[in-house]
């Protein structure tokens, strides 16, 4: 790849910022534009010295290669200007699809667990071989002459069909984007189409009934804890330090692995990593060493201590993710009360999953909901957070300007969950708690 100047429209997007960091590491000139409001991804961009400008068509110069975020339409002023200048314009997923061609590429797809699994795989392979990676939490690393390229593959709007990777891990199939997909069959169709673009093998979760139906040109290996899985975790042990297991490929013992992560899903994510490493004939002892020193990814069970409280920040916004996050909190802190603070994400999703939200949030010792976070595409809806709290014993709606109800808890765990701007509620609570 010859050196070029890449201009990102929407550089603070989580995938976009990660891709910007990868290209910067590989020696290219990188700059871009976005809203001026602070976004958690800009810390990494600023540390790399990557220029972030406010949107302005005058930013674009002859010779730039433009990478446009998927949320911007063709009539965006900067995209229009790029066309006037005759610049090459890629959409994010199109560019990533081209970039991975020079490596042994491993994508991670699925409705839930993508970012955690991508992060775990990137960390583990990096400790064993030269690895570039792009994670959906805004983290990206480009290592010149890498053997592996690990990336998160998002199924939204079928964008992942731009990818033809060597391997694909598929964590699960769920109807997670009711604003785009028509139902489970439609999502399955997208995954099966992608499966037929994979070059070497697919590693899929064995307990997913949809993934069990996959038909592909390459082998599909299933991972899990049941006898019918190809890659299997046995002798699973979960305690307050993390999770350990013996990994088998059919009847062959690959090795014993420990990962300092919590929740049932963490064992599955680690097993998927072991499966890919095994197929690439990497040393199991080195893989075990790297899994054992993993420290997690941004916004996935990120913890801090303040006063006598443990505060957890997590991106969970689908009922299955909330269930997994609360399960992880119970494993790590079996003797503490678990307080859930959840920001529902979009009216359509909240309405589609109302009974499931009631069920999973009832598993916390106490539940609070913030008002629903609306998206740019959908400003209002028929459902309110009060409709959910009314169905959970003792639950209430909490507002950023009054986080006092949380001050009644001591020596407990507060888990803030959501994909919107839940962090502003967490900050408001931390400020109150620190002053107390």
UniProtKB/Swiss-Prot annotation:
Keywords assigned: ATP-binding, Cell cycle, Cell division, Cell shape, Cell wall biogenesis/degradation, Cytoplasm, Ligase, Nucleotide-binding, Peptidoglycan synthesis
EC number of the protein: 6.3.2.8
User: Pathway, according to UniProt?
Assistant: Cell wall biogenesis; peptidoglycan biosynthesis
Q: Which Pfam families match?
A: Mur_ligase (PF01225), Mur_ligase_C (PF02875), Mur_ligase_M (PF08245)
Q: Which residues bind ATP?
A: 110-116
InterPro entries tied to this protein: Mur-like_cat_sf (IPR036565), Mur_ligase_C (IPR004101), Mur_ligase_C_dom_sf (IPR036615), Mur_ligase_cen (IPR013221), Mur_ligase_N (IPR000713), MurCDEF_pg_biosynth (IPR050061), UDP-N-AcMur_Ala_ligase_MurC (IPR005758)
Annotated catalysed reactions: UDP-N-acetyl-alpha-D-muramate + L-alanine + ATP = UDP-N-acetyl-alpha-D-muramoyl-L-alanine + ADP + phosphate + H(+)
Q: Which domain of life is it from?
A: Bacteria
Compartments in which it is found = Cytoplasm
- Provide the Gene Ontology terms for cellular component: cytoplasm
> What's its top-level EC category?
ligase
Q: Name one GO molecular function term.
A: ATP binding
**What GO terms describe the biological role, i.e. biological process, of this protein?**
cell division; cell wall organization; peptidoglycan biosynthetic process; regulation of cell shape
What the entry lists under SUPFAM superfamilies is as follows: MurCD N-terminal domain, MurD-like peptide ligases, catalytic domain, MurD-like peptide ligases, peptide-binding domain
Identify the main location.
Answer: cytoplasm
What this chain does, per the entry, is described as: Cell wall formation.
Q: What PANTHER family does the annotation carry? A: UDP-N-ACETYLMURAMATE--L-ALANINE LIGASE, UDP-N-ACETYLMURAMATE--L-ALANINE LIGASE-RELATED
Similarity field: Belongs to the MurCDEF family.
Q: How is this protein named in the record? A: UDP-N-acetylmuramate--L-alanine ligase
Q: Which gene encodes it?
A: murC
């Amino acid at each position: 790849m010859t050196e070029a100047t890449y201009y990102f429209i929407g550089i603070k997007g989580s995938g976009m910022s990660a891709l910007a960091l990868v290209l910067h590491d590989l020696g290219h000139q990188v700059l871009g534009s976005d809203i001026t409001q602070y976004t958690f991804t800009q810390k990494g961009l600023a540390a790399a010295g990557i220029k972030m400008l406010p949107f302005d068509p005058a930013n674009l110069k002859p010779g730039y290669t433009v990478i446009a975020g998927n949320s911007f339409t063709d009539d965006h002023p900067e995209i229009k200007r790029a066309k006037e200048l005759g610049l090459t314009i890629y959409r994010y997923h199109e560019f990533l699809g081209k970039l991975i061609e020079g490596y042994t590429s491993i994508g991670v797809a699925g409705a839930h667990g993508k970012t955690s699994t991508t992060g775990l795989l990137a960390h583990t392979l990096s400790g064993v071989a030269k690895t570039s990676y792009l994670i959906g939490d805004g983290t990206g690393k480009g290592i010149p002459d890498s053997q592996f390229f690990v990336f998160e593959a998002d199924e939204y709007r079928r964008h992942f069909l731009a990818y033809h990777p060597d391997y694909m891990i598929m964590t699960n199939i769920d109807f997670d984007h009711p604003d785009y997909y028509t139902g489970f069959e439609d999502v399955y169709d997208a995954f099966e189409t992608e499966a037929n673009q994979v070059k070497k093998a697919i590693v899929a979760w064995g307990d997913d009934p949809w993934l069990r139906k996959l038909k592909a040109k390459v082998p599909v290996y299933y991972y899990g804890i049941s006898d019918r899985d190809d890659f299997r975790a046995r002798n699973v042990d979960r305690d307050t330090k993390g999770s350990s297991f013996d990994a088998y490929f059919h009847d062959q013992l690959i090795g014993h692995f420990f990962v300092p992560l919590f929740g049932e899903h963490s064992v599955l994510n680690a097993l998927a990593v072991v499966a890919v490493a095994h197929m690439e004939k990497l040393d199991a002892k080195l893989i075990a060493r790297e899994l054992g020193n993993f420290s997690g990814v941004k916004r996935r069970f990120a913890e801090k201590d303040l006063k006598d409280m443990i505060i957890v920040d997590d991106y969970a916004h689908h009922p299955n993710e909330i269930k997994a996050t609360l399960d992880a909190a119970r494993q790590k802190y079996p003797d503490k009360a678990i307080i859930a603070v959840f920001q529902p994400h979009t009216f359509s999703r909240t309405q589609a999953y109302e009974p499931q939200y009631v069920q999973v949030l009832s598993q916390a010792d106490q539940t609070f909901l913030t008002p629903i976070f609306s998206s740019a595409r959908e400003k209002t809806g028929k459902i309110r957070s009060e409709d959910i709290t009314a169905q959970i014993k003792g639950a209430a709606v909490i507002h950023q300007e009054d986080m006092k109800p949380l001050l009644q808890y001591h020596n407990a765990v507060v888990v803030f969950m959501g994909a919107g701007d839940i962090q502003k509620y967490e900050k408001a609570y931390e400020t109150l708690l620190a002053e107390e």
